[in-house]
Amino acid sequence: GKVTGQPLYRLLGGKVRDKVLCYSHVLGKTNEEKAALAASYVKERGLKVIRLRAGAPAANGTLGGGVQDGPKVEPWTPEEEIYNTVEFFIRVREQVGREVGIIYDLHERFSPAQAIRIIRQLEPYDPFFIEDPVAPDCIASLRSVREKTSVPIAFGELYKSRHECLPAITGRLVDYIRCDVIRIGGITEARKIAVLAETYDVKTAWHGPNDVSPITHAVNWHLNVS
């Protein structure tokens, strides 16, 4: 792009849209704080979609809800965590209303049966999509989740090439393929994945956490508008 003096999207075939739907991940030390912040994120930042994950007890403290040197938590069970996840999502939906899309990341925490239970309970509250309900190499489990739920599924941030994406895309087991452009090998591989996904009516939602560079986010934007 720099050599030719052109934006990347033009080298990829030209711009087909002027705007890209973006979301922001809602951060907070506790679930209560995250739920309260969700509405302010929407109002102050003009967001149409937000992404969240409930903090959960874990072996070394708390995951997403505490600090490393904080007080130890009590033992927990999957049943408690399922309830915690569903209750948190409902609370956030009540805070932001029906017009805002909510992305929820299960982050491979649950068994396929547990993921199915959670997603079914969330269906009336209209998630924008559920991210990573099972591990990336568990295609049979992903198929089970797909067949037994109706919420859109996003998947693929740990994939390293288009070849690893094939079963999820060609089987139409996901609604969004969510690869990390750096992890899969760059712009060329990402473009091939996007074309493959479009063939099977799968959308792209490139992985864009806050620990990647602004350059990577810029690449995501150019891929999305081209």
Where do the model's predicted regions map?
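Residue-level detector of short coil/turn "hinge" positions at structural boundaries
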Residues: P7-L8, V49, D175, T204
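Metal- or metallocofactor-binding catalytic centers and their adjacent structured scaffolds
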Residues: G1-V3
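Metal-dependent enolase-superfamily TIM-barrel catalytic cores that perform enediolate-based chemistry
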Residues: K19-K148
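Proline-centered loop/turn at the N-terminus of a beta-strand
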Residues: P7, L21, G101, P152, ...
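Flexible hinge/switch segments at interdomain interfaces of large molecular machines
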Residues: L12-R17
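Shared catalytic-loop signature of beta/alpha-barrel
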Residues: R120-F129, A135-S226
